[in-house]
């Protein structure tokens, strides 16, 4: 553990997680005073650093750093960590072992290691948390659902803009967001479906299907990338949420064009008799920032500024009501 810094009402310490031949930057944030609990922040898809920025695309929502520091102000410790990818600070230590990270299941392995590290580091610092919560953002919510089912030390799960369907289903919903003026959404989705038929069979997408409305960006993914996407898509998030035994808080923004509002309702319905609460914020986007109406999806995704503190207010209030398992 290195680089201890003070951040207002918190201390932040940089760590490295070593899992399956790779080293991941992570940051432990510890509040001043009594610790109400600890939150593991599980990142979503794409190449994000520990703060929740995307250096490869120069998109910097800073969402995980904002959440961590707001949580600390509310008395909660947290751990956030990077994902493999350009500019995120991850390092390959053993190339043969690191092949494991081409499998979606390894995301759960990394999250489990991060959870154990968070608990150990807090205990060593004399700040053991009375309750532990796993908060997964976007695709990270799916990881959180899978982790919590086999983690008795987890007292609660927070679904932050989590999907209720597989990744290819989410991609299909987004097809209409990237069309030129006048293009037909129905035609674009038909093109997308034709391309995905090849992906589901493990085939390369034919060249004649690339570059059409609905498939403009699909040519950037190679066969290995599609193999990984198929693994993610094979998981049914709503079904996995139903199997989570812990209490769950679902947080959703009404102007989220990446994972739309109906997913929150579908996950809540899938929970059945499970203890579930929904915190809905009509004007927030995917990174929980207020979004002016009519903002184009790509501009919405790149929005900077502080993450709305009402999200952490909801997490902290809900979390304090959880009885430790």
Residue spans for each PLM region:
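Alpha/beta-hydrolase active-site loop
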Residues: 99-122
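Accessory cap/linker subdomain of secreted extracellular hydrolases
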Residues: 158-239
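N-terminal cap/lid segment of alpha/beta-hydrolase-fold proteins
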Residues: 2-34, 38
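Short alpha-helix in the alpha/beta-hydrolase fold that links the catalytic acid
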Residues: 246, 259-269
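Primarily recognizes the serine-hydrolase "nucleophile elbow" in alpha/beta-hydrolase
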Residues: 117-178
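Short beta-strand/loop motif that positions the catalytic acidic residue
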Residues: 244, 250-252
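Catalytic active-site module of serine/aspartate enzymes centered on a nucleophile-bearing elbow/loop
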Residues: 287, 293-325
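Short, surface-exposed "cap/lid" segments of acyl-processing enzymes
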Residues: 33-35, 39-73
């Amino acid at each position: 553990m290195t680089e201890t810094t003070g951040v207002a009402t918190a201390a932040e310490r940089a760590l490295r997680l070593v899992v399956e031949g790779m080293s991941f930057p992570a940051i432990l944030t510890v509040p001043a005073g009594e610790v109400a609990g600890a939150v593991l922040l599980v990142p979503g898809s794409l190449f994000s650093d520990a703060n929740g920025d995307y250096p490869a695309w120069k998109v910097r929502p800073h969402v995980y750093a904002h959440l961590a520091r707001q949580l600390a102000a509310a008395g909660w410790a947290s751990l956030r960590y990077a994902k493999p990818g350009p500019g995120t600070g991850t390092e390959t230590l053993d190339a043969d072992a690191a092949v494991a990270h081409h499998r979606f299941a390894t995301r759960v392995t990394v999250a489990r290691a991060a959870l154990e590290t968070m608990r150990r580091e807090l205990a060593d610092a004399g700040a053991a948390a009375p309750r532990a919560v796993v908060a997964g953002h976007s695709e990270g919510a799916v990881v959180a659902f899978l982790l919590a089912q086999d983690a008795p030390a987890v007292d609660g799960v927070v679904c932050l803009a989590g999907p209720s369907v597989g990744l290819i289903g989410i991609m299909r919903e987004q097809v209409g967001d990237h069309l030129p003026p006048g293009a037909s959404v129905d035609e674009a989705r038909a093109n997308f479906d034709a391309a995905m038929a090849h992906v589901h069979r493990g085939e390369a997408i034919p060249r004649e299907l690339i570059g059409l409305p609905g498939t403009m960006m699909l040519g950037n993914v190679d066969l290995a990338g599609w193999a990984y996407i198929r693994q993610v898509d094979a998981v049914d998030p709503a079904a996995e949420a139903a199997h989570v035994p812990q209490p769950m808080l679902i947080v959703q923004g009404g102007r989220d064009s990446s994972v739309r509002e109906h997913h929150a309702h579908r996950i809540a319905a899938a929970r059945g008799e499970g203890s579930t609460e929904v915190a809905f914020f009509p004007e927030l986007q995917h990174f929980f920032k207020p979004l002016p109406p009519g903002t184009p999806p790509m501009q919405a995704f790149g929005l900077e500024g502080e993450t709305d503190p009402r999200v952490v207010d909801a997490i902290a209030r809900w979390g304090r009501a959880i009885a430790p398992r």
